[in-house]
Amino acid sequence: MRKISLISIAMLIVSIPTFAGGLLTNTNQHPAFLRMLSRGANTTSVDAALSNPAGLAFLPKDGFYTSLSIQSAFQTRNIDASCEALGLDKYYEGKASAPVIPSVFAAYKKGDWTISGFFGITGGGGKASFDDGLSMFDAMVIGGLLQQGIPGKAYTLNSYMDGKQYIYSVQLGLTYKITDWLSAFAGGRMNYFTGGYKGALNASAAVDLPMPTGGAIPVGTELIGIDLDCSQTGWGFTPVIGLDAKFGKLTIGAKYEFKANLNIENNTKVNSLRMIGAPESELEDYKHGVNTPNDIPAMLSVAAAYEFLPVLRASVEYHFYDDKNVGMAGGKQKFLTKGTNEYLDRKSTRLNSSH
């Protein structure tokens, strides 16, 4: 019984990244995205340095182009969990926040050549806090203690978890205008991952509990305890290539980002797993110095835009993320059947040149 409970707790902690945001791609890197979701065929503004870098060859005139934007994102993640068999009926409230999401774009165009750069947060889920723990905490612990004959009303359970994940990226590249209608881009992006988890769990006896070997477990005795304080860092490189073609009022942009091999390394200050009757141990995945694969998947972007009028434009865009062929913690990619498909479409009215 004790072995099963220990495994349950370990599984519980491993699943926490899902609630901290996981390895997500942040598509929105510029306020213009809120007006037009499909940016992959953009050739008129500097944010194309990320969404359609080959299209920078068709910027209106030679010279420097720069853009700095700061956005904020806040979200509540609430869970209403109940399980009659486990005696679980509780409402959990979590708060996720990314108060500062900076993006910097720059490009210099001279004739047929354009050099461009970008800095921003391209992945991660920001910060998430669950002050009353997670339903998984309670369910796993309740299940483990029930297997040892300890009913839910016989103990009190307290837990909390804070998590954060960010991927900071710097991209540089060169665009060349091959013909009057075709251009190409080649460059690369350096990605730096920083994140971590800090939390605690304590299940203690609420009444005197009988021991199988005789005697009793006094009120207040810790039955299960977890303390974790682990920060994680890592880096990886993403090669990027792109093409852009203009056929009158029709623009087609394509970009391919190769897979970035990224391993994150633990810098663990606290890692304690305790269960009554067993020696103190550690959570294997969060031991100091352990490396975990968290690759950034290859991504294909294809977009088309058509300008009906000088003030009216329609665009569509397709993204494919090859999640199946990357390295993930615990080999999670083996359970995927395919990658992720994303579709964006939008009609846009350009009100003035200040956008």
Language model features: what each stretch is:
Residues 16-124:
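N-terminal, post-signal peptide beta-strand-biased segments of exported outer-membrane/organellar beta-barrel
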Residues 47, 97-102, 166-170, 233-239, ...:
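Residues that define the transmembrane beta-barrel architecture of outer-membrane proteins
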Residues 61, 110-113, 179-181, 247-250, ...:
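Outer-membrane beta-barrel channels and translocator barrels
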Residues 66-74, 117-121, 186-190, 254-258, ...:
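Transmembrane beta-barrel strands of outer-membrane/channel proteins
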Residues 84-86, 131-158, 194-230, 264-289, ...:
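Solvent-exposed loop segments that connect transmembrane elements
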Residues 104, 172, 241-243, 252, ...:
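Membrane-embedded beta-strands of outer-membrane beta-barrel proteins
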Residues 107-110, 176, 190, 241-247, ...:
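Residue-level signature of outer-membrane beta-barrel architecture
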Residues 345-355:
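Conserved small/polar residues in nucleotide/adenosyl-binding loops
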